[in-house]
Amino acid sequence: MTEKEKMLAHQWYDANFDKDLETERVRAKDLCFDFNQTRPSDDSRRQAILTELFGYTLENVAINSPFDTDYGWNVKLGKNVFVNSNCYFMDGGGITIGNDVFIGPSCGFYTAHHPLTPKERNAGLELAQPITIGNNIWFGGNVVVTPGVTIGDGSVIAAGSVVTKDVPPNSLVAGVPAKVIREINENDAPKN
């Protein structure tokens, strides 16, 4: 089994010293660099770079620069997704984002675990677990989502939260570590 196959099977793998994975990360970093150097008004060039990075054509997805990801091909973005500036997708474990999702500035989606023991950590071992984001979700700025987390449809993650556990649908979540504050319901709709 290759290190990439181990990564995709959510097993411990060599993240630092495997040449094939390193080559794929360098490819993604080069594409992110190119994307981040384009003018915001050059939409056709920016979309072409993102299509090459992710491996598919995006549907009404806006990503502000700077943006960074480890591989790109392991990120699945739904329709009508907005990613604000300075976001990082550590996508070794896979990141799936549903439709109609707003991601505030400086958010991080981290799929990698490292060993607690220094010998194994220094050997480059890593365990990647998926992050799954449902539909109609809003992330405030500076949110961190950790490996293996699923966030249910209709939820709001308050700015500065660190999400370490699954979030039920229609939940307002805040804090470090993030906790469910309450359920979101029709009474939360703006009134004139």
From Swiss-Prot:
Q: Which family does it belong to?
A: Belongs to the transferase hexapeptide repeat family.
Q: Which domain of life is it from?
A: Bacteria
Sorted alphabetically, the Gene Ontology cellular component annotations on this record are: cytosol
Protein name per UniProt: Putative acetyltransferase SH0499
What is the organism of origin for this protein? Staphylococcus haemolyticus (strain JCSC1435)
Keyword field:
Acyltransferase, Repeat, Transferase
EC?
A: 2.3.1.-
Matching entries from Pfam families are given as: Hexapep_2, Mac
Q: Name one GO molecular function term.
A: acetyltransferase activity
List the InterPro entries. Hexapep, Hexapeptide_acetyltransf, Mac_dom, Trimer_LpxA-like_sf
Q: Does the keyword Acyltransferase apply?
A: yes
Q: What class of enzyme is it?
A: transferase
